[in-house]
């Protein structure tokens, strides 16, 4: 199957403009994404970055490009300040929990992976763990030192940013936005200089430290991403993603390290640097530093399916701020439910035409996840789209144009909804279009059902068996025409957060309880 015709366009933070995307290797896109520092749970703002990156990867796969995707796990070196001050976040978390750093890292890494699974986010090709690459980091820093880009202080080995004429490309050389918010470390030649290796002080008791040419200590946070991206993707790869808060300091420092290591000012690490914007609430940017933040578990405990958060993310462009509020997440849940109901009804219409086992051959053969594991896209998309006619192909072309234009997913999701209501299409055409579109949107619409969206809130006063018993009693009262008793049971269920759905196949559902 030929690739869709729309060219892929991205806003490149490096050039500050929209550019045509052409991979370095036409056979494979190389993509690196900054991963979490695993000292705490990922909050919803953190997770927005991975919904964005997953959508990006899905779109590239859908367009015909296999993707070699690397995400790092930072389990050492990230200080409470993005510069070189404060405590190591991992050391501080371990001390507070009275556990080893390894135990803390393992716990929060597994929690993060669980969040990604709940959001239907694909695993990368490689999970790159920082502490597995310490020797690589030492060798990388040593080469930069030999090239004359460093100096030593009592606190460690520092990168001399004055050696690079174009330092701060991503920040546009705007000190007010980048350098201006870096705290000063005594002895640094310039405020923007940063640690490649932080030497342990003699009176410091650290759980994690390694022997190096600069004394025992730990790598700087910025060093980790340069080393791991280059190791797995090469000196210059296609795309680097991360949150917009990384753009002014962390990613500027990555670029500086890459240029110093290669000796080539043109080798910034990636041709395209893509940054997602913040998730905000009434108090501003969602942040762990505020001490109180919302996690995916917060939503699940409120009775909200995690894919409702994915719907919310799809409703705003990745470069725009996204507002989180109770009203917004509940509206996203309602939107998800409507989609699941509509797709379920559509599947029933299509299945009625199939004599064998109620499911079309193409639907049985289609595995939404297999295309991310190297399955040929011409098979996966060809399986779905081959029989589509003019009207359906026109919709698919509009969808292609939206997702190819800097990932305009807020335009793409309404096209899926429009397809569901399009009476000019045959039901099977509609379902085939939904299947193709959802390869990018990632809502698992062909497999979700309403029952899976019916989640009991953690603080609900009744257990499901109590609810079923009361519903059975209510049915009995209705048969006996004791409507007063029937209404009383309905009211009791409503007060307990259960909506009775007479005439609906589901019968009843939990009402989300939002107390955050």
Curated annotation (Swiss-Prot):
The keyword Ligase applies. GO terms for cellular component: cytosol. Binds 1 zinc ion per subunit. Monomer. CDD domains: CysRS_core. This is Cysteine--tRNA ligase. Belongs to the class-I aminoacyl-tRNA synthetase family. The keyword Aminoacyl-tRNA synthetase applies. PANTHER family: CYSTEINE--TRNA LIGASE, CYTOPLASMIC, CYSTEINYL-TRNA SYNTHETASE. Its EC number is 6.1.1.16. A motif ('HIGH' region) lies at residues 36-46. ATP binds at residue 288.
């Amino acid at each position: 199957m030929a690739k869709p015709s729309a060219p892929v366009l991205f806003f490149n933070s490096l050039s500050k403009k929209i550019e045509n995307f052409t991979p370095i290797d036409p056979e494979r896109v190389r993509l690196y994404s900054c991963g979490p520092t695993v000292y705490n749970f990922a909050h919803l703002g953190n997770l927005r970055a991975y919904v964005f990156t997953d959508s990006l990867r899905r779109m590239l796969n859908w367009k015909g490009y296999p993707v070699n995707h690397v995400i790092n796990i930072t389990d050492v070196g990230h200080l409470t300040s993005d510069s070189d001050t404060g405590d190591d976040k991992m050391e501080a978390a371990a001390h507070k929990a009275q556990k080893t750093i390894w135990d803390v890292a393992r716990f929060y890494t597994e929690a993060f992976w669980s969040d990604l699974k709940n959001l239907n986010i694909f695993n990368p090709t490689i999970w790159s763990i920082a502490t597995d690459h310490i020797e690589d980091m030492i060798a990388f820093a040593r080469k930069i030192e030999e090239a004359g880009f460093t100096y030593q202080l009592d606190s460690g080995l520092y990168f001399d940013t004055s050696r690079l004429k174009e330092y701060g490309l991503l920040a546009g050389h705007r000190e007010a936005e980048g350098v201006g918010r870096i705290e000063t470390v005594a002895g640094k030649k310039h405020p923007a200089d940063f640690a490649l290796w932080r030497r342990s002080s003699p009176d410091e008791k650290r759980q994690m430290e390694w022997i190096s040419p600069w004394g025992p200590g730990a790598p700087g946070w910025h060093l980790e991403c340069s080393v791991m991206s280059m190791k797995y993707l090469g000196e210059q790869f296609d795309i680097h993603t991360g949150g917009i808060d990384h753009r002014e300091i962390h990613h500027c420092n990555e670029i500086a390290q890459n240029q110093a290591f290669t000796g080539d000012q043109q080798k910034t690490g990636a041709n395209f640097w893509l940054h997602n914007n913040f998730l905000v609430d009434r108090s501003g940017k969602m942040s762990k530093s505020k001490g109180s933040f919302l996690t995916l578990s917060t939503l699940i405990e409120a009775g909200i399916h995690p894919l409702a958060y994915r719907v919310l993310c799809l409703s705003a462009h990745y470069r725009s701020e996204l507002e989180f509020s109770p009203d917004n997440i509940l509206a996203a849940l309602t939107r998800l439910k409507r989609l699941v109901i509509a797709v379920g009804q559509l599947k029933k219409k299509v299945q009625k035409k199939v004599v064998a086992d109620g499911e079309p051959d193409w639907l049985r053969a289609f595995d939404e996840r297999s295309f991310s594991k190297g399955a040929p896209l011409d098979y996966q998309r060809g399986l779905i789209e081959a029989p589509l006619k003019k009207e359906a192909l026109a919709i698919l072309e509009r969808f292609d144009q939206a997702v190819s234009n800097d990932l305009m997913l807020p335009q793409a999701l309404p096209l899926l909804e429009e397809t569901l209501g399009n009476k000019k299409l045959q039901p099977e055409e509609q379902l085939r279009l939904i299947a193709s579109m959802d390869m990018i949107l990632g809502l698992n619409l062909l497999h979700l059902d309403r029952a899976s969206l019916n989640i009991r809130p953690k603080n609900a006063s009744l257990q499901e068996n109590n609810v079923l018993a009361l519903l059975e009693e209510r049915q009995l009262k209705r048969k006996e025409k004791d409507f007063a008793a029937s209404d009383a049971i309905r009211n009791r269920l409503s007060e307990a957060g259960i909506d009775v759905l007479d005439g609906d196949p589901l019968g009843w559902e939990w009402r989300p309880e939002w107390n955050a």
